[in-house]
Amino acid sequence: MLTLGELAKKLDAELIGEASHVVDGLGTIQSAGPSQLTFLANPRYRSFLEQTNAGAVLIPESQREFCPVPALIVKDPYLSFAKASAFFEVAPQVQPGVHPAAVVDATAQIHTSASIGPNAVVEAGVIVGEGAVIMANSVVGAGCHIGDQCRIWPNVTIYHGVTLGPRTTIHANCVIGGDGFGFAFNGAGWTKLHQVGGVTIGADVEIGAGTTVDRGAIEDTIIGDGVILDNQIQVAHNVVIGDHTAIAGKAGIAGSAKIGSFCLIGGAAGIAGHIEVCDKVQILAMSLVSSSIKEPGTYGSALPVDSQSRYRRNVARFRNLDDLARRVRKLERLSD
């Protein structure tokens, strides 16, 4: 619960309205009530702004005259709304200490302010930093280092030899440090290449539910500072992801791929192994990246949806492209 005056100071915003007005939650611009904060970032939704009943709206200067309720004028309304969300988050309360039902090896080093939940397992040699939280049923393997203020949600499995930087969040059902997909064909079957590397995850990383990050075959799989990974992403062994890259759900990154910093990768995109993607690349959803990308920019390869009849006709034409290309070359030679 904050007054608009307090919010304006925290967000470095210009307040239009009563500084004493109190907001106690967040809402959409269509549904927010008199005690809720909302935002308008896209001018296409101005009609919602003109009809809103919100307690206050975060808006850019250009929308000042259209706002019928108290406003907070900011440069980037969505960014300011994201910052404001931290003031209203209702997160589960945890208490420092080790739950009686947790299993913690005697050699583990647990900071006195850390919290270990029921049925969690913390194996030998683990270091758990100040204010870190390991919730119910999660397992932290031998020799791991869990940084200060990390939050590991329930049912996470972190294999041995994994390092989490400070303030990193791992959501439920993630597996960090499982074996990479390394096998050598021996003529009659497969011989496993034992994965002896680890996983190093930087500071301020967020990894969504059900995502898997495999350990390195020899050297570590590395995820840089500030990376955000959505739900159900596969990161294979020895992948390197640069700082502040964002990857949407169901993307798959094959072994030893290197992705630069400040990249945006859309949902269900596939990155082939042993290639490099430079900094500041945007890859559209469902695209297949089969070779290295050396220039920043936006790239895509997926076909957009179409009616069934048009799609089937286009597929038929696609199958004839090779023959068509030969005919065109023949005509070009005849015309010379």
UniProtKB/Swiss-Prot annotation:
Any one of the GO CC terms: membrane
Pfam families: Hexapep, LpxD
Protein's GO biological process: lipid A biosynthetic process
Source superkingdom: Bacteria
EC number(s) from the headed UniProt entry: 2.3.1.191
Metabolic or biological pathway, per its Swiss-Prot or TrEMBL entry: Bacterial outer membrane biogenesis; LPS lipid A biosynthesis
Record carries keyword Signal: no
Top EC group: transferase
Record field: catalytic activity: a UDP-3-O-[(3R)-3-hydroxyacyl]-alpha-D-glucosamine + a (3R)-hydroxyacyl-[ACP] = a UDP-2-N,3-O-bis[(3R)-3-hydroxyacyl]-alpha-D-glucosamine + holo-[ACP] + H(+)
GO MF terms held by the record: N-acyltransferase activity
Active site, renumbered: H237
Entries under InterPro entries matching the protein: Hexapep, LpxD, Trimer_LpxA-like_sf, UDP_GlcNAc_AcTrfase_non-rep
CDD domains (UniProt xref): LbH_LpxD (cd03352)
Keywords: Acyltransferase, Lipid A biosynthesis, Lipid biosynthesis, Lipid metabolism, Repeat, Transferase
NCBIfam families: lipid_A_lpxD, PRK00892.1
HAMAP family in the cross-refs: LpxD
Subunit structure as annotated in this protein's UniProt entry: Homotrimer.
Family (UniProt): Belongs to the transferase hexapeptide repeat family. LpxD subfamily.
Protein role: Catalyzes the N-acylation of UDP-3-O-acylglucosamine using 3-hydroxyacyl-ACP as the acyl donor. Is involved in the biosynthesis of lipid A, a phosphorylated glycolipid that anchors the lipopolysaccharide to the outer membrane of the cell.
Protein name: UDP-3-O-acylglucosamine N-acyltransferase
Species: Alcanivorax borkumensis (strain ATCC 700651 / DSM 11573 / NCIMB 13689 / SK2)
